[in-house]
Amino acid sequence: MNTQHSKTDVILIGGGIMSATLGTLLKELTPEKDIQLFERLSQPGEESSNVWNNAGTGHSALCELNYTKEGKDGSVDITKAIHINEQFQLSKQFWAYLIREGHIESPDKFIQSVPHMSFVKGEENVKFLKSRVASLQKNVLFEKMKISQDPEKINSWVPLMMEGRQSDEAIAITYDETGTDVNFGALTKKLIANLQQKNVGINYKHEVLDIKKLNNGNWQVVVKDLNTSNVMNYESKFVFIGAGGASLPLLQKTKIKESKHIGGFPVSGLFLRCKNPDVIHRHHAKVYGKAEVGAPPMSVPHLDTRFVNGEKSLLFGPFAGFSPKFLKNGSYLDLVKSVKPNNMITMLSAGVKEFNLTKYLVSQLMLSNEERINDLRVFLPEAKDEDWEVITAGQRVQVIKDTDKSKGQLQFGTEVITSEDGSLAALLGASPGASTAVDIMFDVLQRCYKSEFKSWEPKIKEMVPSFGLKLSEHEDMYHSINEEVKKYLNVK
């Protein structure tokens, strides 16, 4: 085992959409910085960012009902929906900038217009959906949203969903043509190819073994070349851990105080994938339903048109599975090894409190294929068993942490952890994840490059014109920027 030493300005751990986005931003803002990226697999975007390991929804709250809460008085709080949409607007603006400047090309290889729709059954749910739409339509970001209970109109949008449906059940569906399907794996590959052209060191089959703080304030990152078994010690001023499910174990190695009292709970996702080309081509939408009362947000069922390498696909899910692995390509010991003296009570507290999640997971694990198809028939009444197969999607590690209110709170979002001095950042959590990559990386830059960020703002506004503003409060600006985005990304 040979050990070598090398110095750099920035180390990115993980070859997914988050590291690719941060690396791209840094090279635009401060091209002189030396950057090294390490990925354990043989190519980028193959774990959480892989097209089959996520639903590919450009999360904009156009169809996801869990982003709008219903009050006891029937009112609907759209605050989170607006925030999620604003985040995705930033991502689209940045991608459009990269296309315009020639840094990446062929947007149709990673983003497609696919209508986003919400689907509910039952009088109470229909009432909620109407209230949701009435609240959202007042906001410019949701101005194109439509709603219908008319069977003929719904049939024109999603004919397969109406075939064989009983006419006496109350249903309602919304339709928004501005929705998208995003292949984050393909986008990641484009971003990293661009980084390679800008002399960023891209190191595949390299595994990070340890991360230690040095006396001079820099970080020592110990990396193993899996091809040669050589071990390198890299010294870096800044480290970003964007390794999906592996981010938590790597963060724990840093021993920073912000890494204490945080745990992770892995959840595997299963989907039904359609094998019948006729069925696939007769549906063109991402249709999200409503989670059952008491079920976690990750359980929201959806029927998804996907585009994979130019081919149309159709998926339904998710169904939860369980594996103690933190990555699809991880170890069965990941969960056990993540339990430390400083987070044991945190983890146990969550286990006691999250009975609904435990109950949900047990019920999901016991589902037969026939029961999964029956769930699908809520969306497609005439779905046939032989047209569908079960596939395993990616692993997601839900964050468990202590809050001011209590110990062991399960978090269902995406979370950035930074060291006190801003020299290290880690990204934990799951949905909405990749869709919000640009906004999240701006957050990382603001927290970790405080002294430089102000001088970067003119360039940031060139790349993302609405940075620092809320498009929902600037109607004319939204329309102007959106025309540019539509032109370069070729979306609606």
Curated annotation (Swiss-Prot):
Pfam families: Mqo
Keyword line: FAD, Flavoprotein, Oxidoreductase, Tricarboxylic acid cycle
GO molecular function, one term: L-malate dehydrogenase (quinone) activity
EC number: 1.1.5.4
Highest taxon listed in the record's lineage: Bacteria
Cofactor(s), by name: FAD
InterPro entries: FAD/NAD-bd_sf (IPR036188), MQO (IPR006231)
Top EC class for this record: oxidoreductase
Gene Ontology terms: biological process: tricarboxylic acid cycle
Gene3D superfamilies, per database record: D-Amino Acid Oxidase, subunit A, domain 2, FAD/NAD(P)-binding domain
Catalytic activity: (S)-malate + a quinone = a quinol + oxaloacetate
Pathway the protein takes part in: Carbohydrate metabolism; tricarboxylic acid cycle; oxaloacetate from (S)-malate (quinone route): step 1/1
UniProt similarity note: Belongs to the MQO family.
Record's protein name: Probable malate:quinone oxidoreductase 1
